[in-house]
Amino acid sequence: MFTIYTYILVFVTKYRGKVFTKEVLDDVEKSFIEVCSKFESQLIEFNGESDHVHLLVSYPPKVSISALVNSLKGVSSRMIRKKKYQSIESKLWDDALWSPSYFASSCGGAPIDILRQYIEQQNTPS
C-alpha cells in the first residue's frame, strides 16, 4: 500500500511584518510548487495574507516534514531577496523573511475539499 501524508502548514513572516502583496504571494506560490516537485510532493492548495501563508501539501513518507519546510522557506526567501520587491526590501530583518518557527498539522482523514475550502477562505491582500 502506498502512503501519502497530507499536512496543513502555516508560515509567518519575521516579526509578523505585513510584507505580502498579491504579486509577491503569486511568486511565493510558484516557488513552493517547484520545491514540492523536487521532493516528489504536491502543493494542493495555497493562500496567504499580508503576514503569513497557508499551505496544504501532500508528500511521501521518505520525505521529512522539516526538510520540506526548510526548503520551502529557504527557496522562497532567496527568490524574494533576488527579485528585490520595493514593498519588502526595506522590511526584511537581517535578510530573514520567515519566522524560524512554523505550524504543521496532519490532516488525518479530513476530506481534502474541506481543507481546501478553509485555505481558500483566507484573505489575500490586494
Name each region found by the language model.
Residues M1-S126:
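Basic nucleic-acid-binding interfaces
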